[in-house]
């Protein structure tokens, strides 16, 4: 039995958001195919995550150095540690997120800040940083209304590229990716584009 963490990085409803459609399709298909797995769903926007600020940074640093923390630093550190531990303990992690203003939503970025922890998800070495999460299976589900896979707009795509960079930094070198794009660029083909993409999501979920 695997422990699977599903991370939803969009506050909109399934009727309003393509990335949430991808998320829900993956969750439902995965549960049906793997009824005995432990599934944890994390809606980032429901968590009201505090930014990685000076208090949290001090708490994380001091804890790592076994120094005394203030009450505020300890509380902030515990918040980050809770999500970090949840991520580390999962055998598989699925992220669903949109491209917003060329990058990922701010709440998801804050969550990823929590996960980037030296000594836990990566280590510094003389040869450079080394990821420690190489055994973890990761899927990245990304929706973007325009076309960013190729052409001049490709260099502007910093959502999927960012997430690939982050999980790669953690040691996950081959995340499974599914992208639905172009549905806003060609509205008359939107339904076809979305449905085709959701079929791909189902296929990936069945074998994930």
UniProtKB/Swiss-Prot annotation:
Enzyme Commission number(s): 1.6.5.-, 1.7.1.17
Keywords, in A-Z order: Flavoprotein, FMN, NAD, Oxidoreductase
Catalytic activity: 2 a quinone + NADH + H(+) = 2 a 1,4-benzosemiquinone + NAD(+); N,N-dimethyl-1,4-phenylenediamine + anthranilate + 2 NAD(+) = 2-(4-dimethylaminophenyl)diazenylbenzoate + 2 NADH + 2 H(+)
Record-listed FMN binding positions: 17-19
Domain of life: Bacteria
Cofactor binding note: Binds 1 FMN per subunit.
Molecular-function GO terms, alphabetical: electron transfer activity; FMN binding; oxidoreductase activity, acting on NAD(P)H as acceptor; oxidoreductase activity, acting on NAD(P)H, quinone or similar compound as acceptor
CC cofactor: FMN
InterPro entries for this protein: Flavodoxin_fold, Flavoprotein-like_sf, FMN-dep_NADH:Q_OxRdtase_AzoR1, NADH:quinone_OxRdtase_FMN_depd
Family note: Belongs to the azoreductase type 1 family.
Summary of subunit composition and partner proteins: Homodimer.
Functional note: Quinone reductase that provides resistance to thiol-specific stress caused by electrophilic quinones.
HAMAP family per the UniProt record, alphabetical: Azoreductase_type1
Name of this protein: FMN-dependent NADH:quinone oxidoreductase 2
Lineage summary: Bacteria, Bacillati, Bacillota, Bacilli, Bacillales
